[in-house]
Amino acid sequence: MIDRIWFGHSRLYLLLLPFSWLYGLITWLIRLSYRSGLRVAWRSPIPIVVVGNLTVGGNGKTPIVIWLVEQLKKRGLQVGVVSRGYSGKSGKYPLILSHHTQPEEAGDEPVVIFQRTGVPVAVAPKRKEAIRALLKKHPLDLLIADDGLQHYALKRDFELVVIDGIRRFGNACLLPAGPMRENITRLHSVDAIIINGGEAQKEEILMQLRPSQAVNLVTGEKKPVEELISVIAMAGIGHPDRFFMMLAQLGVNIIKTQIFSDHQHYTLSTLLPLAKKTQSLCMTEKDAVKCKAFAQPNWWYLPVSADFPFVQSQKLLASIEALCHRIC
């Protein structure tokens, strides 16, 4: 229902507009309090690159964070990542991730980032606490704040916004009448805009998600995803249809799709009935990190990586690297 209101042609959003006006006023007052000096944002001793959204839901931030980390490491920088750790509940914050950290503690996205990159990752409701914890243990040159665009308590040196190139801004209304966390005019003040799929407009950088081979959750075996038989596709992400469309474009024989809520908590009893032993259950990497403890031999996940035009990507990386040299 909410997707039809935000991204369809339903006029039910009109009923929610008064609440959106109130939300807009509150967010404007928060930003104003920092700009006027009534509230003081915390400045990290090393550069902060924020990767965030203007809209609610899965726009593809995690693959971009992973790409940034990998590319900046190749340039010789020591990089760390901080996050709110949404959906995770730890007994103590800040939490620095290790190979034993579970998604239930840190959230699924920080765990994926840590497992894919191996760089220091910390989560805390207050990002400055996560940053301080990392800097006590690691000599870092630069930090990436995952989903921190609206966290104005943290000063940032570079803002990167990710937009779903297919759905873009929906009806362009603020929450709850629409998907917007902030007004579209916020784009005028950011440093880079990345479009996930679709067609890039002026000043936007086009990103494509490139799938690799499917990975078995139990054995680690890899094979082309189109070789999986009788596939039941499931996704608990912000935009599950993107995952299903990717599988279809790869020629996967999809028998059924199953959508779960974003950041869904999974159990064996929930997933076991979805696919028979003669079928393949295929999921996203973000879902997979929450299912490995009870995975079955016919469960697979499909990792994806961000891919950018060479010239634009090098310009983006050079801008971020220059920040570090200037501040450090």
From Swiss-Prot:
ATP binds at T55, V56, G57, G58, N59, G60, K61, T62. InterPro entries: LpxK, P-loop_NTPase. SUPFAM superfamilies: P-loop containing nucleoside triphosphate hydrolases. GO terms for molecular function: ATP binding; tetraacyldisaccharide 4'-kinase activity. It holds the Pfam family LpxK. Keywords: ATP-binding, Kinase, Lipid A biosynthesis, Lipid biosynthesis, Lipid metabolism, Nucleotide-binding, Transferase. This is Tetraacyldisaccharide 4'-kinase. Transfers the gamma-phosphate of ATP to the 4'-position of a tetraacyldisaccharide 1-phosphate intermediate (termed DS-1-P) to form tetraacyldisaccharide 1,4'-bis-phosphate (lipid IVA). Belongs to the LpxK family. NCBIfam families: lpxK. Transmembrane segments: none annotated. It comes from Hamiltonella defensa subsp. Acyrthosiphon pisum (strain 5AT). One of its GO terms (cellular component) is plasma membrane. Its EC number is 2.7.1.130. GO terms for biological process: lipid A biosynthetic process; lipopolysaccharide core region biosynthetic process. It catalyses: a lipid A disaccharide + ATP = a lipid IVA + ADP + H(+). Pathway: Glycolipid biosynthesis; lipid IV(A) biosynthesis; lipid IV(A) from (3R)-3-hydroxytetradecanoyl-[acyl-carrier-protein] and UDP-N-acetyl-alpha-D-glucosamine: step 6/6.
